[in-house]
Structures are given as C-alpha cells and as structure tokens.
Amino acid sequence: MSLVIPEIASIHDVGFAADVQQLLDGKTKPVGSLGLLEQLAHRIACILGTDKPVLEAPQMVVFAGDHGLAAQGVSAYPVDVTWQMVENFMAGGAAVSVLARQHGIALNVVDCGVARDFDVREQDPHDKSPKEGEPRLWRRKVAYGTQDCSQGPAMTEQECAMAMRNGMELVKKLPGNALLLGEMGIGNTSTASLLLAKLCGTSVVEVTGMGTGLDAAGVKRKIAVLQQVLEKHKAVTDPLQVLAAMGGLEVATMVGAVLQAAQERRVIVADGFITTAAVLVASRLRPAVLERCVYAHRSGERGHNLMLLELGAQPLLDWQLRLGEGSGAATAWPLLPAACAILREMASFNSAGVATKCD
C-alpha cells in the first residue's frame, strides 16, 4: 500500500510529567482530591507540552460512509439513514449538532464514502470556511460505500490508502489543538467488532452487540455474519490489510486523521466504539498515538469496554451512551477545558497563603 504514514515519537518526558504532578499536588486542596480531573489535567499538559494548557478551536469531525456488509442485515436501520443523518448534521438537528453548538465546538462532516452525492453547500465549493457556528461539509468520497466484506475485501488497498491520506490532509487544514472524533455509517458497529476481534484475537461473540437496536435474533444473525467475515479473511494479519479487508471508508479516513493529529500533538478525543476502533488501528501502526488520546466515555455497546482495556484507557464518563456521531465526545468536552483551568488558574498553598497539611 503506497502510503507514507507520519512518524510519531513518544512524548513521554519523566521530568516534565513529575513537574506537572508537583504543580497539581501544590494546589489548595488535599493531594489527589480532584480525582480524575487532576489526571485529565496532567494528561492534557503532557500532550500539549505545557504546564499552562489552553485548548484552542476544538474541531469535531464526523466521518461518514456506507458499508456493503449492511446488505447482510447486520443493522436495524436501512442504509439510507447514513445520508439522511448527514443532512441532519448539516441542518443542525442531530445530537452531535446540538452538543457541539452548545459547547462552542466547530462541527465538520466528512463524506468519506456515502452511497449518495450531496448538494454543494454555499460555503463548500472550494473548502471555504462556513459562517461561524455553521457545520462544514468536506467532500472526500473515495467510493460509494465499501464492498460486502463477507464476500471479499471491503476496500482495495488503494482505496484504503486514499481514505487514510484524505484524513491526514484534512487534519492539516483544521485549526486548533483538539480533535474530537465522530462517525456515521449504517453497519459500522460490525466493522468495529471485526477490527477488535481480528486485531486483538477476541471472540466475535464477546464483542458484538445490538448496534442501532437489533433484537436478540438480530444479534445472533449479526454474529454469524461476522464469523463468516473473519473466516473469509483469516489469512490477513497486517493492520493495514485488516483495515482494507473489513474496515470502512469512514474508519480508514479517521485512522489517517488520528495519525496526523497525533503527529501534530493535538489532543485526540475518542467518542465510542467505532472511533476507538480507529484509534486501535492507528495504534497498531504507530503505538505513540495512544499518548495523545483522551477517551470520552465507556459505550453501552458491547465490546467497547474490552477495547478500552486493550488500550489501557480510562474513560471520562460511564453513562451507557451508544449513539455515536461524536455525541459522547461532545458531552464530555467541558471536562477538558475545566481540567486545564485547574492547572492554570487554581492557587497554590504558597501563592494563596494557605497552611498546608499538618505533619
């Protein structure tokens, strides 16, 4: 696959990490009393390389694409929902639209491989910026959906490489230092289950859930289809070939975006099951990606907890969210600037003239 993957060096700096921890411990509070908020502040400081972190121009990117595997009945919804939801994102009516607007997060929607063309938006003939607060549509279609991976590869290696390259180039154009991941694609929980099972050697039974709302019989049928896919591609082991064989165009584009964001030392906020699957693939290509990631929540989708454990990840929320779109990332977002403010603005015992703990 002719693709140049950016080099991503480790940002682990023992001395700097210790200095940040000392700053946090010296704030006017018992040591560790702000719990995970302190850990979040520490992580963001280490990602950005400063003990006075500021999150600037956060970008929510919703990657959209259709899946040939959906023809096998692995979703409770028809494939038309993918393009209909893209229109909903652009109209401002989806959950992620509302939450991004509420928290001042720029919303970008990327057509990576939706099985329908979209009208040219006034703001998008040449990737011009939309009016402030309006969503932005990026047309980066590689194909009109993937092929049915129960019959053959979902993508050619060239299509997969093109999608990843699109993701890298897109991030280069985005302002700010924080990338929030979202997705839309009927059938993409199946893709996430397949990637987890294949890359981590986990039983597909353990990582396959209801997705958009399948009943028990539907989940059983979905598992049977996914087992067929894994059998079809059992000889494939290389992460890029696995992604091409059973991934999605939106997932491949997201993998590229994650790699580029990590190379630029942006804070990467993963949403739920599908976006974490993209992080998993990216980490198999460049392990230091994980040092730049924050995980918004533990999804109610079966398999996500196993994926988080595989990545050694501590999610911020555990609210049984399983909508996707980036809705969980947008919900958790206010915790990140709050954590940064604690590190930047909270007084120390010395500066406030407050007595420390008795010996």
Regions found by a protein language model. Give the residues of each.
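N-terminal loops that bind phosphate or other acidic moieties
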Residues: 1-359
